[in-house]
């Protein structure tokens, strides 16, 4: 297959060209049940959205293309992290409102689906039972819309990892507590197939996945393809991360005999070499969140892969607020 690389010019035409160059709608029927899965995992006013969540203009452009194609059964689905601010307000809906996806849905007559609420289907991933939203499993055509960002646990968070949003909340936690995060991400992409992947690279994020410690850079790039492995290999390469060193991609490549050879994958549009960056994915809470505040006597070690996104966001917010309210404080007693 082919991965398209298109510079974003601020109009829907960029998205259209990216889809056309990779023949993204080749297998899409007008009567297909379509699910758009953006990365809208969390949204809060203290966290700038740039590089963290899928840009609303990209989602809307995809909706418009689907309607032009003749599709009418279109849903936008996400399962955001547990709401750590107000348990009475489902956080997925909070995210839809915060990013304007609720407005897009009303404007174009498409459905919004909270994947956290199920119903779910039990799926076995290498001996570990997880629950996947039935909405994702029954879709005839799944459009995977991740962001071009790094991740302090998995090096990158692109198409493969974006499908974690299709899991039930308890299954998301199980991915981390099982101590097999990368393998489970790999296996999940066998159970839930992406028919089109479109990586939103309008911004790219260093030291992700959130923007309290992470830094967003304007990139104005759209990456599109019909093979999630190829798109993630190209996306990781652009971020400056060796895709062969990403464990869930290596797991998948070994199981399916896939190659990391970029020449074999093939790209069209912009020249890949000219797009390469060197972003840092490593993130140490001690240095990034406590260091600038000159707080002493307190330690926040790297949690490894055992911390889920909800807990990670909570930790980042808590440390950020602690540092803001207690600069240069010695907690050592």
Where are these regions (language model features)?
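N-terminal and secondary-structure boundary signal
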Residues: 1-333
């Amino acid at each position: 297959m082919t991965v398209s690389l298109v510079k974003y010019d601020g109009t829907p035409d960029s998205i259209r060209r990216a889809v056309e160059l990779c023949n993204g709608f080749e297998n899409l029927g007008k009567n297909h049940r379509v699910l758009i899965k953006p990365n809208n995992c969390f949204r809060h006013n203290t966290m700038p959205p740039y590089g963290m969540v899928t840009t609303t203009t990209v989602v809307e452009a995809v909706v418009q293309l689907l309607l032009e194609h003749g599709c009418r059964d279109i849903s936008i689905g996400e399962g955001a992290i547990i709401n750590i601010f107000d348990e009475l307000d489902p956080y997925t809906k909070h995210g839809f409102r915060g990013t304007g996806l609720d407005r897009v849905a009303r404007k174009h007559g498409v459905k919004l689906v909270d994947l956290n609420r199920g119903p779910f289907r039990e799926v076995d991933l290498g001996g570990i039972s997880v629950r996947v939203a039935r909405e994702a499993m029954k879709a005839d055509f799944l459009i995977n819309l991740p962001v071009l960002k790094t991740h302090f646990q998995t090096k990158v968070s692109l198409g493969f990892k974006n499908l974690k949003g299709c899991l039930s909340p308890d299954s998301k936690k199980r991915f981390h507590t099982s101590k097999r995060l990368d393998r489970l991400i790999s296996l999940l992409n066998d159970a839930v197939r992406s028919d089109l992947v479109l990586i939103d690279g309008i911004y790219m994020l260093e030291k992700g996945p959130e923007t309290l410690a992470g830094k967003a850079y304007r990139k104005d790039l759209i990456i599109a393809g019909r093979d999630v492995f190829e798109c993630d290999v190209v996306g990781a390469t652009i971020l400056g991360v060796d895709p062969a060193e990403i464990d869930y991609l290596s797991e998948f490549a070994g199981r399916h005999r896939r190659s990391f050879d970029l020449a074999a994958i093939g790209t069209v549009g912009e020249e890949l070499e000219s797009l390469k960056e060197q972003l840092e994915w490593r993130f140490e809470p001690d240095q990034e969140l406590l260091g600038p505040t000159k707080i002493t006597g307190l330690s926040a070690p790297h949690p490894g892969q055992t911390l889920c996104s909800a807990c990670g966001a909570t930790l980042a917010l808590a440390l950020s607020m602690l540092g803001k309210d207690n600069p240069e404080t010695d907690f050592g007693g």
